[in-house]
Amino acid sequence: MKRIKNVLIFFLAMVMLGACRDKKSEKKEEENIQQENTFVNPLKTEGAQCWANYYDGWYYYMQEAVDRLELWRTRDITDLEHAEHKVIWIPKDPSNAHHLWGPEIHPIAGKWYVYYAASDDNMDNHQLFVLENSSADPFEGEFELKGRISTDKNNNWAIHPNVFEH
């Protein structure tokens, strides 16, 4: 009985000793490990699924947004964080007004086109869409929805558009 009592006291002492550890240094250690294993984009600290295009002395940049499309431009890509930017499209049609992903801007035949994926708020219904701006400068004029891009007869899930000239 005395042996069980001693083992129990020893066990309780170990539990109490473990509870006295320095949680601040443990948290700091975890943060250091995360910082060592995390890449921070030096050009822009926030933004997913980004796209950059260099045209006529300007860098044009787009990134994912939940409910709108924004465009940045700068002559110095290393100063993207401070670049001029504007909202170029806010969808009004509920079929393409949610989860705007992977926008890309392309100058083609004197016009500007933005390709992106969006849904009707059901993640299974992502489709591709295209906007057009007839202005030579994408910061001038207005982007107009040209429509959904049909990728197949079953309207399967479609994301991450890209175009090329042939």
Language model region names:
Residues 20-166:
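Carbohydrate-active catalytic/glycan-binding domains of CAZyme proteins
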